Amino acid sequence: PGAAKNQLITFKGKSVSGALANQTGTISIPKGKPPKGGWPVFSWAHGTTGIADACAPSAAKLPKGEALLPKLLKAGYAVVRADYEGLGSAGEHPYLNGPSEGRSVLDIVRAARKTNRSIGKTLLMGGHSQGGHAALWAAKLAPSYAPELKLKGTAVFAPASHIGDQASLVRNLDTPAFSPIVGLILRGADIAAPALGVESLLSDAGKAAYPETLTNCIGNLTSWSTLAANAILAPDANVQSLVDYLNANDPEDLSVKTPVLVLQGTTDTTVLPIFTTQLLSKFKQNRVPVTGNAYKGLNHGTVVSSAKPLADAASFLRKRT
């Protein structure tokens, strides 16, 4: 809403294998005349939707969790949203593979600039949950992968991190609350790194539920929503190689040179505040120019839809344009 023009595009992006592959996404151009140098562009990385093609955000209406985007569009930013590799396009989505997601967030900016000469080189980025993970990877990759772009800052809401730590704890969880996400994490790792042999790690119940990760979106993984997390893996499964893979894709050790704002709700039970605190601590140790804001009483959904964090993110981005 509020755009002079909205486009659904197919563009070439670098896949998890390193080959070029078609990907999809959207471009929104502000109303009015672009400033000298072109519209600054904001690349938004979406949160978890699923792995099936039907879960691609470009196929749906703008969700409540993307309330920041119309605000930035009205303020004079071109807004782009990548669906990520394998969502809404050929191939499968390597969920939470950092390099794949990060490149998608940058590749759509390149594609947008080729098709819309009014878009300039000034880049800002943001994301929520999986998208926070993706945007942080994009911030790390930008100087070497897309040096023609001028990245000014990245704002992330409840960014996914410490997935390896959480995978190690699956056997201790006797409820199904996290099981749908666990299913997607397993499938994403399997797609990105088949040599891990993920399916061989599953229990009979896990194997029975596993195909659903390729067909259903996050809100409809019914087999997983009734499967206790500690029943997903086989009793004798050795998950160390899987944990090593997940740790290699964690954003915690990324070297990011441009400013980062991390916004976290204190009552989030999906991306736990303790993990975001650890992420911030490691960033500061590594001299990442990061600011962390905690929002009392906000959870995983409300942190990206409530007035205060939205205003703080918009202010952070505007100051760096």
Question: Which stretches of residues belong to each language-model region?
Answer:
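Accessory cap/linker subdomain of secreted extracellular hydrolases
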Residues: F157-E252
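Alpha/beta-hydrolase active-site loop
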Residues: Y95-N116
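Acidic catalytic loop of the alpha/beta-hydrolase fold
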Residues: I163, T266-V271
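C-terminal catalytic histidine-bearing segment of alpha/beta-hydrolase fold enzymes
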Residues: P235-D244, T270, T277-T321
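Short beta-strand/loop motif that positions the catalytic acidic residue
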Residues: V256, L261-D268
